[in-house]
Amino acid sequence: MHPTFSRILLAAALASAGSPAVATEIQLEQGWNAEQRASWYDASLGSRLLPLAWAQALERPDSEEHLFSEDNARRLGFPLRNWQGGELRLPRGFALDQQDDSQFSDTRLRWKARQSSSEPWVGLNCAGCHSTDISYRGSELTVDAGATLANVQAIFDEVLAALRRTSDDGDKFARFAGNVLGSEDSPANRDLLKAALAKRAALIDTLLSMSATDLQPGPGRLDATGQSLNRAAINSGARHLQANPTDAPTSFPALWHTLQMDKLQSSGFVPNVKVLDLNGQVFDLGYLAGDIGVVQGDYGDVVSHPLSGLEGYISSIRVDNLTRVEGLIHKLKAPAWPSQLFGAPDSARLAQGKRLYEENCAACHASIGRDDLQTPIKVRQVRLKAHGDDAPIGTDPWMACNTFTFSSPSGNYFGLFRPSLGTPSGVGIVGRTSKIADMQVPEVFQIMLGKKGQLADGIAEIIHAIVTGQQTLPGSDSLQALPTGQLLLAGGDPAGSQAPSLAAGEVPADKSARKDYCLNTEHPFLGYIARPLNGIWATAPYLHNG
């Protein structure tokens, strides 16, 4: 889990904010100390977008300005910061990833003779999409794990355009090669470098072409779910991929209280299942599964193979660091309104807002104290179709509809066991063509098995049982502690327990017909969840449908 700003200009500031030469930086209290904040911004999760040497040398497509210059990084919404407090400056939300790539696929690139198999790469981490800046009257506030207003899609598009232009423009390539190769610059190494450039551009182009749409998400929004699903389809190794336009951008959620919620993602399609490890500690299995999907969409390297057993898939995804980051989120608090800077809220307006909230919002959005980081939160989901006493939600259906219907040939995922957890079609076997969400879940479990050494004691055995169909997850909504190694929280109603099994071939290809299909189908994934609204003052834009 980036054109323009990562700055929220509060409405009150528009008339009065100046342009100070030096801004006063203010860090809000959110439950983290300095070391924990540094871990949030510096940890590699296994995303590998570009080799570091390339990122430092790559120019913007239409100029000689470096792609990650101070000005361009800030324009895109990723101000540069000193990674791990050292001299290396990376866009905020980018981290250095250095692993042995000998068994990787997409990122096992060689651009010079006798090159190391542990070249450093850069890629996104959680802070890339979940950190916020607020500018107000000469002060700069940082909101940790908030909702970015960076233009995430633009940075991917610019990277691809820069790779292509560098490969095609002789002068650009000469400058690039000189910077990347240094003392090892030679005709032979330039040939290797050009081939590596072409390979990297082709991989990024495959994902962006598969996801192509005329809709531009712009700052603060991204169809991250669609991108993650399409990346899972690419990682299947299937030869003939099906285009699935990522035309359902949503704003980025703030992450406080999310580990307490029973459903995750805008449509609630990821049940926040928790299990107990052999030491009796709660392990956030559902949250980890969702995060692995996000890192995969952000150019994590995954190597799938047919009919995988229990050895799992090799990948660059850092399950160990994901688990540590989730530990940080357990401690994260929503930012309190900074009265010392903005002034105390008007008491009359507070009373008016409280009344409006109780009349129009409280029925869906649960209330929880800012300091309450333990109480489980059962989120309210409102369906696209009328359901029981609920009227249809009446908002943009496409994030939920696309997640439910995106399909593709299954490639190496064919024959994997499909658990009820997080799959639209419930328990079964992945077929030759499948809904991507039906095959991404078993794929993510295979990624976990490939990192079993980074899992807590006993968790690999639970995943073994799930992927072989020996343990299925109940449909109960109850929150209860069960014996060690068993399910702790079902996280809502798994699709397989109550929903019809729907084959990919039943989904209409025509978009208008697909919309009608989603609006008239009863399914737990076809709706949106309403979460607690703590800290919402810091999470613009305020779109009710995300």
Language model: regions and residue ranges:
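Generic anion/oxyanion-binding catalytic loop in active/binding sites
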Residues: A12, F342, G535
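Cleavable N-terminal signal peptides
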Residues: A11-A12, A21
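Bacterial N-terminal signal peptides that target proteins for export
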Residues: M1-L9
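Extended surface/linker regions that mediate inter-domain or inter-protein docking
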Residues: T24-R137, L141-G146, D157-L160, R164-E358, ...
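Gly/Gly-Pro-rich "capping" loops immediately C-terminal to redox-active cysteine motifs
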Residues: Y136-D157, W256-H257, G268, D372-P409, ...
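N-terminal signal peptide c-region/cleavage motif recognized by signal peptidases
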Residues: S16-G18
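C-terminal engagement modules used by replication, chromatin/transcription, nuclear envelope/ESCRT
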Residues: T375-T472, L482
